[in-house]
Amino acid sequence: DGAMDDHIQIKVSNMNIKDEQIQTLHPQPGKTNKKISLKKYAKIKKQLLAILSKKELTHTELMEALYEKVKDSFEGGVQWYGETVKLDLEARDIIERTNSKPEKYRLKKANP
């Protein structure tokens, strides 16, 4: 019965997706960032970029906005993952800090 084999196949591939990790980057040279679930990384990254596409926010505002968006659907510490992914996005030149006081975060203009 081939149906049983298909079921097992699907289960295994789902597991692999879930367990895939990404080594996040750190904006300061010589510092290493965390290795986290790729699925969680993708979810947090998408939300951070969506939030910052609307306006510049301070660190606190950004983390609060992120928490509001994912608190009902995210497993794990939202602030911890938010911070990890935010640093990674800075290291990849996708977001940047402003020179204003208080310091804010924004999307880098070069990105399409």
List the model feature ranges, each with a label.
Residues 67-83:
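Short, positively charged loop/turn segments that connect secondary-structure elements
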Residues 5-43:
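Long, low-complexity, charged/polar intrinsically disordered regions in eukaryotic proteins
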Residues 100-112:
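Short, cationic-aromatic polyanion-contact patches
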Residues 57-68:
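Short acidic, hydrophobic short linear motifs in intrinsically disordered regions
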Residues 38-56, 87:
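Positively charged, polyanion-binding regions of nucleic-acid-associated proteins
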Residues 90-98:
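A short, conserved structural fragment
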Residues 52, 70-74, 93:
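Short amphipathic alpha-helical interaction patches enriched in hydrophobic/aromatic residues
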